[in-house]
UniProtKB/Swiss-Prot annotation:
Family: Belongs to the iron/ascorbate-dependent oxidoreductase family.
Superkingdom, taxonomy of origin: Eukaryota
Keyword Protease applies: no
Cofactor(s) listed: Fe cation
Protein name: 1-aminocyclopropane-1-carboxylate oxidase homolog 2
Keywords: Iron, Metal-binding, Oxidoreductase
One MF term in the entry's GO annotations: metal ion binding
Organism field: Arabidopsis thaliana (Mouse-ear cress)
Residue span(s) of domain Fe2OG dioxygenase: 217-318
Biological processes, Gene Ontology terms: biosynthetic process
Gene3D superfamilies, per database record: B-lactam Antibiotic, Isopenicillin N Synthase, Chain
Residues binding Fe cation: 241, 243, 297
Record keyword Thylakoid present: no
Length: 369
């Protein structure tokens, strides 16, 4: 009688713990020479699917717009107006756009990416000393912040730090990327102020309106490392999610992988040399009462032969307890367009967002009126 093969049991909790305790992340798995990814990284076929081809009424949608910021110095009123109109349309329809001539030097962009790569490619014993899930630390290096709560892990490692309003002391940051993190975050804060002015004008408000609401007071920098994946069709670099920030400034690699979901279809975001990718976060959708939208996005697993890196800078208010509540801006609501969201503190929203983890439904749904 032919024997029946029994599939080996899968103890997910034990495998997650074993992976986490290596303290070397996905990079450690790749360095070990694996040819198949562990089951904890397997995502469902439903999540991995991408409906194609596009229906005829969406064929005109190529990808997210690219907007020229004129070196952040609009001497020409027409160019200024065009930038505002471009941002208004992109923020309302895509929630994403790329910016060129943004005032951050190409040299600094490359140095920042090199710093991320240099950190993650240090010897494992160096990285192990910094690996932690103590989210109270100034600097955190780990793999998958939601490792124990997500349905499946993502094929990436990350380090992050809050750079504003209370920047870390130099000794709090790894020497290998310290200087470039400090300089890049300063430049992103300057760019962020300019972007929030344009976004305010796009809403028909005073240029300082969003700044006065402290939308750009806090800045959190996440530096992702996506090693080559031996089975990229089974997992993600980052699973689908929207950002729980007001605004995100993303420094991408020239290895593509970012996709944005619009009307149920995933659109590739092409590499534009020297560009930064800007996207609307949940909190900006909330306070603009859906005038600007925060779309879900994801990163495909890396098919290249070298690692992909990216740097995401999230504009919040700040992480310290703050009684200030945020709801739809009063100038943007009326009897015909009543508030769609209830008021919340940033801390309450962040607690819910982080507890929910990536994937699934938008955290905004829980704050609907």
């Amino acid at each position: 009688m032919e024997s029946t093969k029994i599939a080996p049991s899968f103890d997910r909790a034990s495998e997650l713990k074993a992976f986490d305790e290596t303290k070397t992340g996905v990079k450690g798995l790749v360095d070990s020479g694996i040819s198949k990814i562990p089951r904890i990284f397997h995502h469902s076929s439903v999540e991995l699917a991408n409906p194609k081809p596009l229906p005829s009424d969406l064929l005109h949608l190529k990808t997210i717009p690219t907007i020229d910021l004129g070196g952040r110095d609009f001497q020409d009123a027409i160019k200024h107006k065009n930038a505002i109109e471009g941002i208004k349309e992109a923020a309302a329809k895509w929630g994403f756009f790329q910016v060129i001539n943004h005032g951050v030097s190409l040299e600094l962009l490359e140095k920042m990416k090199d710093g991320v790569r240099d950190f993650h490619e240090q010897p494992p014993e160096v990285r192990k000393d910094l690996y932690s899930r103590d989210f109270g630390r100034k600097f955190i290096y780990l793999s998958n912040f939601d490792l124990y709560t997500a349905a499946a892990a993502n094929w990436r490692d990350t380090f992050y730090c809050y750079m504003a309003p209370d920047p870390p002391e130099p000794q709090d940051l790894p020497e290998i990327c310290r200087d470039v993190m400090m300089e890049y975050s300063k430049q992103v804060m300057i760019l962020g102020e300019f972007l929030f002015e344009l976004l305010s004008e796009a809403l028909g408000l005073n240029p300082n309106h969003l700044k006065d609401m402290e939308c750009l007071k806090g800045l959190r920098m996440l530096c992702h490392y996506f090693p080559p994946c031996p089975e990229p069709d089974l997992t993600f670099g980052t699973s689908k999610h929207s950002d729980g920030s007001f605004l995100t400034v993303l420094l991408p690699d020239n290895i593509e992988g970012l996709q944005v979901c619009r009307e149920g279809y995933w659109f590739d975001v092409p590499h534009v040399p020297g560009a930064l990718i800007i996207n609307i976060g949940d909190l900006l959708q909330l306070i603009t009462n859906d005038k600007f939208i925060s779309l879900k996005h994801r990163v495909l697993a890396n098919r290249a032969t070298r690692a992909r890196v990216s740097v995401a800078c999230f504009f919040h208010t700040h992480v310290k307890p703050n009684p200030r509540v945020y709801g739809p801006i009063k100038e943007l609501v009326s009897e015909e367009n009543p508030p769609k969201y209830r008021e919340t503190t940033i801390r309450d929203y962040a607690t819910y967002f982080n507890g929910k983890g990536l994937g699934g439904t938008s955290a905004l749904l829980d704050f609907k009126v």
